[in-house]
Structures are given as C-alpha cells and as structure tokens.
C-alpha cells in the first residue's frame, strides 16, 4: 500500500472518491466529529478550503471513536455540516481511524511503512494530515493546531 491514489473510500453520499482526481493539489485530511470541543474548526476548514481551493482539497473524515462524538447518520452529519458551518468541502463516509478496523486511508496516513515519511497515532478528533500535490505525506498536526495555522498554509501552493 504505497500509493495514496489507490486507496478507496466513499463520500458521505456513498459515492466513490478517487484521490487520483486530486493529483496536482495538496490534500488535508481531518477526522471530524459534531460533538467535540474542536467542532468549531469546521468554520476554519471551510475558510481554508475557500481561500486555497485552487491548490488544496479539504476532506473531512467522520469518526465516532473518540468519546462517541460523531454518532450521527450520514444524512445527519451532512445536515449538521451544511446548516451550522456551510461546509462545501468533501466529507467521507464514517470510518475508523485507529484500531483493528482502521480504514486503509488511515493505515496509509499513520504508518511509515505505507506513507514513506513517518508513523503517528490519531489521538483525538480534528487531527490533520497534509499530503502534497504528488500524493506524499508532508506532516500531521494535532487537534490543537488551527486549520488556518501557518504550520499548514506554508506548505500549500
């Protein structure tokens, strides 16, 4: 599993997302949840997406593994994101980001043997992973790092 572009995941609406469609743009993956202290980061994620959308794809990945803070159905998640934060960036189906049922996307993002860069553990909701325009992991950022932080934006373009 050396290539991000070969990994399969569905959108919140159940349609396949082809990461290969995003070659030439950076991708920011964020595990998201509706009932988290960091949920307000949806606003900054949307701001970041709008500001850099010619060069950046933002992908929210719902996960219910941290404090059961994303219990909603696909329809509930979509409505929450649109009504409360005007989210227009991609949201995937709900997946596990750690553990024995970890989704292959997160197996790639968190394991050096897959991404070629570094290993990490997803510690909480709104942890961010930035991938460059060639599908290579740049770095990860803990929840406390705001989406609009220069730690992230300096790598976009």
Each model region followed by its residue ranges:
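N-terminal "domain-start" segment that seeds a small globular fold
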Residues: 1-20, 40, 104
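Short, internal strand/loop/helix patches
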Residues: 75-123
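Thiol-/selenol-based redox modules, centered on thioredoxin-like
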Residues: 107, 112-157
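Conserved helix-turn-beta segment immediately C-terminal to the redox Cys motif
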Residues: 25-26, 35, 39-64, 81-85
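Amphipathic alpha-helical repeat scaffolds
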Residues: 11, 31-35
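Thiol-based oxidoreductase modules, predominantly thioredoxin-like and allied folds used
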Residues: 55-73, 88-99
């Amino acid at each position: 599993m050396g290539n991000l572009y070969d990994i399969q995941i569905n959108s919140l609406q159940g349609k396949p997302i082809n990461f290969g469609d995003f070659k030439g743009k950076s991708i920011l993956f964020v595990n998201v949840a509706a009932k988290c202290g960091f949920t307000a980061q949806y606003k900054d994620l949307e701001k970041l997406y709008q500001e850099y959308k010619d060069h950046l794809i933002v992908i929210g990945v719902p996960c219910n593994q941290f404090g059961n803070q994303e219990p909603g159905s696909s329809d509930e998640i979509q409505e929450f994101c649109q009504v409360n934060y005007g989210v227009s960036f991609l949201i995937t189906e709900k997946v596990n980001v750690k553990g024995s049922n970890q989704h292959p996307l997160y197996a790639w993002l968190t394991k050096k043997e897959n991404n070629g860069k570094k290993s990490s553990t997803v510690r909480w909701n709104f942890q961010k992973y930035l991938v460059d325009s060639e599908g290579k992991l740049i770095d990860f950022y803990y929840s406390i790092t705001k989406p609009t932080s220069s730690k992230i934006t300096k790598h976009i373009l």
